[in-house]
Amino acid sequence: MPAKTGPRVVVFLECFHCTQKGAQKKFPGVFRYITKKNRHNKSTPLELKKFCPFCLKHTIHKERKK
């Protein structure tokens, strides 16, 4: 029997500042958080202020497309 899929969906939050800086950063790569959101309550893309270890500061993390 298949698992019940509810309104919760897994989303990836990507550091917006890392993607804007491009190649001029100390560490290569972009930091991502994995979280869940409720599709029924929050239909707009998720934006949270989280800590980025590559930027070494709190930055805005935006939901990215899969």
Swiss-Prot record:
It comes from the Eukaryota. One of its GO terms (cellular component) is ribonucleoprotein complex. It is found in: Plastid, Chloroplast. GO terms for molecular function: structural constituent of ribosome. InterPro entries: Ribosomal_bL33, Ribosomal_bL33_CS, Ribosomal_bL33_sf, Ribosomal_zn-bd. Keywords: Chloroplast, Plastid, Ribonucleoprotein, Ribosomal protein. Belongs to the bacterial ribosomal protein bL33 family. This is Large ribosomal subunit protein bL33c. It comes from Welwitschia mirabilis (Tree tumbo).
